[in-house]
A protein has these predicted regions:
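Bacterial N-terminal signal peptides
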Residues: 4-17
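N-terminal maturation segment of proteins
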Residues: 21-585
C-alpha cells in the first residue's frame, strides 16, 4: 500500500511520540530504581532506622560504626551519584526531578561530612549510642519469640558497637578532632549513670516485664535469663569499658576552647554546618546580625506585656515570675498535664488550618531519669508510619519547680501539634514519593516549622493568658539568642561564659536551661541556627502568598503545600511556593 508524503510525516511523528513516551517511562523507572536501591541500602546499613520504621528484617544487629564502613559508605554514595547523573531528567514528572535533586544533595552532603571527619566525634550529650540504645528499646516490637531472640542478639553485639566507637574516637584524638572537655564529661556522666542502673530497673531489661500471651512460661523464663545474662556480661561491661576510655584517654585530650573553630579546618567546617542546617548560603556574620535584630524586636514586644501587667522593665517582671511559685510547676505530673491540655485545645483547631491530618496519635511522657540532666526542655519522637505507634512529646521534668509554666504552651505546639508531630507524621504517611523523602530531615525546615507552629498558635487566638504569651516570646527570643551565641561560639571565638552572660542579659530562662543550652550549642555547631532562619522564611512565604493572592489566599491550602511534599531545603520550598502562588491567581 502506498503512503503519501503527508502520511509519512504523521507516521514518523506518531512513532517518535511513542518512542519519546517510552523513553520518559524508561528513564522514570530507572530513576525510581535508584531511589529504591538507595533506601534499601540505607535500611540495611542503618538497622536502627529500620526498627523505628517497623521493618523487622535487621532487628538482630546494629549499624557498623567502623572507619572501614564509613569509607565503604563513601563508595556507595559515589555509585549512586553516578547513577543519578547518568539519567536525563528532561521531561520527567516534577516529583521525579525533585526527588533526584534531593537525593543528589543528600549524597553530596554526606560525602562532605565524611571529608570533614564528623564521624571521629560521634558522641556528645545530645546524640550518641550511650543513650540512643536504651531509647530504642522503647520502639522495638516484642510480638513473638523471634523478636526477643533478635533483641538478645543485639544485646550481645553491644560490645562490638562500643569497640568501633572507641576506635573512631581514637582516630579523632590523633587528628585533633575531639570534643571539648565539658562535653565529654557530660557523656561520661551519662555512661556511668546507665551502667549503674540495677538490672531490674535497666531500660534494657524492660521487655521482660510484659510478655505477649502467645509466649509460653518456659520460653519467658529462658528469654528473661538470656536477657539478664546479656545485660550483665555484655552490655554493662561495654558501658564500663567505654567510661574508662573516656575518663583515662579521651577527656585528657579534650579541647579547652568550646568553639568548633579550634579543630583543624574548623572555620570551613562551621561554614559547612551553617549550609547544612539552614540549607541556604549565609555567612556567620549575616546570621549573627539577624539574631541581634530579632532579640531587639522580641524584647520590645515583651516589654509591652510587662508594662500592661504593671512592671516598668523586663528585669523586674522576670524577677517577679521567678519569685511566684504559682507560675511554676508544683510537680512533674502537673507539668506533663499542662502540655496535654495545651495540645488538646490545639487539636480542636487543626481542621480549620490543615486539609491533611495524620493517622498517628500523640502522647506526652517524661524524659527518662538517666538522661534528664543533659536533655532539652522537650523533644519529639515520631510514631510509626502505619499509625499504630503514637508519636511522643517527651518532656524534661528535671528541676520542675524551676520551670515556668508560661513557656509550656509554645513548646507543646512546637514539639507536638501543629509542630513536629504533624509534620513528621504527614511525611511518613505520604504516598507517591520515594521512601527516603518521607524520612528526610532538614533542620531549617523541620525546626523552622516547629517555631512557625508556635507563632501559628498566636495567629489563631491562643496564648490568652498574658504569662503564656510572654512565655511564647521568651521561647522566640531564646531561638533568636541562638543565632547570636552559636555564631559567637563557633565563628567569633566567644567563651562559654560569654554565652551564659548573653543569656542572662537578654532572657529570663532558668539557670538549668541556660547551662544546658549553652553546652548544647557547644556540642552541636550550627544546628541551633535552623530554627529562627527557617521560621522567618516560612513567615516570609506566607506573607508573600497573602499579599499576592489577597482574598484567594487559603491557609489550609498553604499549609498543605508546605507539608505535603515532605521536608525540603528552603530554596526548593521557595520555588514550590512561588509556583503555587502563580497557579492560584
Amino acid at each position: 500500500m502506498a503512503v503519501g508524503f503527508s502520511g509519512l510525516i504523521v507516521a514518523v511523528f506518531f512513532f517518535t511520540a511513542i518512542a519519546g513516551a517510552q523513553s520518559v517511562q524508561t528513564r522514570s523507572q530507572a530513576l525510581n530504581a535508584v531511589f529504591t536501591d538507595y533506601w534499601q541500602d540505607h535500611l540495611r546499613h542503618t538497622p536502627e532506622d529500620a526498627t523505628v520504621l517497623g521493618d523487622k528484617r535487621y532487628n538482630d544487629r546494629w549499624s557498623d560504626l567502623s572507619a572501614e564502613e564509613i569509607h565503604r559508605s563513601v563508595e556507595r554514595s559515589r555509585e549512586y551519584i553516578q547513577r543519578i547523573r547518568a539519567i536525563d531528567t528532561a521531561g520527567l514528572p516534577m516529583q521525579d526531578k525533585l526527588s533526584a535533586e534531593l537525593l543528589l544533595r543528600t549524597l553530596l552532603e554526606d560525602q562532605e561530612s565524611v571529608q570533614f571527619r564528623e564521624w571521629e566525634m560521634p558522641v556528645n550529650q545530645i546524640h550518641g549510642i550511650q543513650f540512643e540504645l536504651p531509647q530504642l528499646v522503647a520502639v522495638i516490637p516484642f510480638d513473638d519469640v523471634k523478636d526477643y531472640d533478635n533483641y538478645i542478639a543485639r544485646l550481645k553485639r553491644v560490645p562490638l558497637l562500643f569497640e568501633q566507637l572507641t576506635a573512631d574516637m581514637k582516630l579523632g584524638i590523633d587528628d585533633g578532632h575531639v570534643q571539648p572537655k565539658i562535653v565529654s564529661e557530660k557523656v561520661l556522666a551519662q555512661v556511668n549513670s546507665i551502667a549503674a542502673i540495677q538490672l531490674e530497673d535497666s531500660p534494657f531489661y524492660a521487655p521482660t516485664k510484659k510478655f505477649p500471651a502467645s509466649i509460653t512460661t518456659d520460653e519467658q523464663r529462658r528469654i528473661t535469663g538470656e536477657i539478664s545474662d546479656a545485660i550483665a556480661h555484655d552490655v554493662i561491661p561495654a558501658y564500663q569499658r567505654f567510661a574508662r576510655f573516656l575518663e583515662t584517654q579521651y577527656i585528657p585530650h579534650g579541647r579547652a576552647d568550646p568553639g568548633i573553630w579550634a579543630i583543624p579546618n574548623g572555620d570551613a567546617y562551621y561554614a559547612f554546618c551553617i549550609r547544612s542546617n539552614t540549607t541556604l548560603h549565609m555567612t556567620a556574620d549575616q546570621i549573627h546580625q539577624i539574631g541581634l535584630d530579632e532579640v531587639k524586636r522580641d524584647e520590645a514586644a515583651m516589654l509591652v506585656i510587662a508594662n500592661k501587667l504593671g512592671y516598668k522593665d523586663l528585669k523586674s517582671f522576670n524577677a517577679a515570675i521567678k519569685a511566684n511559685p504559682k507560675l511554676h510547676a508544683a510537680s512533674k505530673e502537673q507539668l506533663l498535664d499542662t502540655y496535654r491540655a495545651d495540645l488538646e485545645q490545639m487539636k480542636a483547631k487543626l481542621p480549620e488550618l490543615f486539609g491533611t491530618l495524620p493517622k498517628a496519635g500523640l502522647i506526652v511522657e517524661a524524659t527518662p531519669a538517666y538522661t534528664e540532666k543533659q536533655r532539652p526542655a522537650a523533644t519529639y519522637e515520631p510514631g510509626s508510619p502505619d499509625g499504630k505507634r503514637p508519636g511522643r512529646v517527651v518532656v524534661n521534668t528535671y528541676n520542675f519547680a524551676e520551670i515556668d509554666l508560661g513557656g509550656a504552651e509554645s513548646i507543646a505546639y512546637h514539639e507536638g501539634i501543629p509542630g513536629h508531630h504533624l509534620q513528621f507524621s504527614i511525611a511518613l504517611e505520604l504516598s507517591g514519593i520515594p521512601e527516603f523523602r518521607k524520612k528526610k530531615e532538614y533542620t531549617a525546615y523541620t525546626e523552622g516549622w516547629g517555631l512557625y507552629a508556635e507563632q501559628l498558635g498566636k495567629d489563631v487566638g491562643f496564648y490568652q493568658d498574658p504569662y503564656s504569651d510572654y512565655g511564647r516570646l521568651q521561647g522566640d527570643i531564646w531561638r533568636a539568642i541562638r543565632l547570636v551565641v552559636d555564631t559567637g561560639l563557633h565563628s567569633k571565638h566567644w567563651t562559654r561564659q560569654q554565652v551564659v552572660d548573653y543569656f542572662h542579659e537578654h532572657s529570663s530562662i532558668d539557670e538549668t536551661n541556660v547551662q544546658r543550652e549553652t553546652d548544647r550549642y557547644i556540642a552541636w555547631p550550627g544546628q541551633a541556627l535552623g530554627y529562627k532562619v527557617g521560621q522567618l522564611k516560612l513567615l516570609e512565604f506566607r506573607q508573600r502568598a497573602q499579599t499576592q493572592l489577597g482574598a484567594k489566599f487559603d491557609i489550609k491550602k498553604f499549609h498543605d503545600l508546605i507539608l505535603d511534599s515532605g521536608a525540603l531545603p528552603l530554596d526548593l520550598l521557595e520555588n514550590s511556593v512561588n509556583d503555587w502562588i502563580a497557579s492560584q491567581k
